[in-house]
Design a protein with these regions (language model features):
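Conserved histidine-centered catalytic loops in small-molecule metabolism enzymes
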Residues: 4, 57-97, 120-125, 211-231
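Active-site metal-binding loops of divalent metal-dependent hydrolases
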Residues: 17, 179-180, 228-229
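Phosphate-handling substructures
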Residues: 82-152
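Acidic, low-complexity terminal tails and accessory targeting/binding regions
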Residues: 1-10, 46, 56, 82, ...
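Alpha-helical packing segments of well-folded alpha/beta enzyme cores
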Residues: 42-46, 73-76, 142, 146-157
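Short hydrophobic/aromatic-enriched beta-strand-loop microsegments
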Residues: 34, 85-96, 194-202
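Short glycine-rich phosphate-binding loop at a beta-alpha junction
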Residues: 58-69, 164-176
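Active-site-proximal alpha-helix that buttresses catalytic centers in soluble enzyme cores
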Residues: 2-88
């Protein structure tokens, strides 16, 4: 069923399901990995409860879906919308490089502990531990580069939703991507720098919700909780 605030456009962020590297805690950027069996079940469970006619994500209310080109994100999209008329070749779906995972450079496939140990051995981070939010990745992306591309995507989304802030017509957007890039996306949606100490959790296969306060495009907001109409 749709929620009580459905007249204001929303942005649903969907993290891909579990992969082998998700299980192991390895930094995964450009490496192409498929979902594990459990990862498939995670997304199928989310889809059965939250995606469909009259549900939280109602395909009839979705005007645009941005999907990371990585295989695990495309697989997640297919599972989320398998019972709808939306497919990857739909006009409403775009494979979007702007929402790909943070380019981890030389840290690709490493554990956080391995990254920190390597940097310490090479005389880096003398004043504290490495943080991807502030320091970025060697031979990969800096926080500034990630910020720039996410801001471009957010601008596209707001251009789509701006004419429909009072529910003139449905204008929900879905973004299917990765744990790190989506948490960065939330921070930038709210106007925060990536290194702001805002702890965010987004489980594999989970859905998060962003919108606007008081139907105002200038007041982007994060749904901490949502009320639902009676059955």
């Amino acid at each position: 069923m749709a929620d009580l605030d459905a007249s204001t456009p929303r942005v649903f962020i969907a993290r891909h399901g579990e992969t082998e590297w998700t299980k192991n805690g390895r930094y995964t950027g450009s490496t192409e990995l498929e979902l594990t069996a459990d990862g498939v079940k995670q997304v199928e469970g989310t889809a059965s409860h939250l995606v469909g006619s009259g549900k939280l994500i109602d395909p009839a209310r979705v005007v645009q879906i941005f999907v990371s080109p990585r295989k695990r994100a495309q697989q997640t999209f297919n599972l989320l919308f398998k019972d709808s008329d939306i497919s990857l070749d739909s006009d409403r779906v775009k494979l979007e490089e702007e929402i790909t995972e943070w380019d981890h450079g030389m840290y690709e496939g490493w554990l956080g502990s391995e990254i920190r140990a390597s940097r310490k051995e090479r005389g880096l981070d003398k004043d504290g531990d490495w943080s991807i939010w502030a320091d970025g990745c060697e031979d990969g992306e800096s926080p500034e580069q990630v910020t720039e591309r996410l801001d471009r995507l957010i601008a596209k989304i707001r251009d789509i939703q701006r004419p429909h802030m009072n529910g003139e017509k449905p204008a929900d957007v879905v973004v299917v991507a990765h744990g790190m890039s989506l948490r960065c996306f939330v921070k930038r949606w709210l106007g925060y720098p990536l290194d702001m100490p805002l702890a965010l959790m987004l489980s594999p296969g989970a859905i998060g919700i962003l919108s606007y306060l008081k139907h105002d495009i200038k007041q982007p907001a994060f749904f901490v909780g949502m009320s639902l109409p009676p059955l």
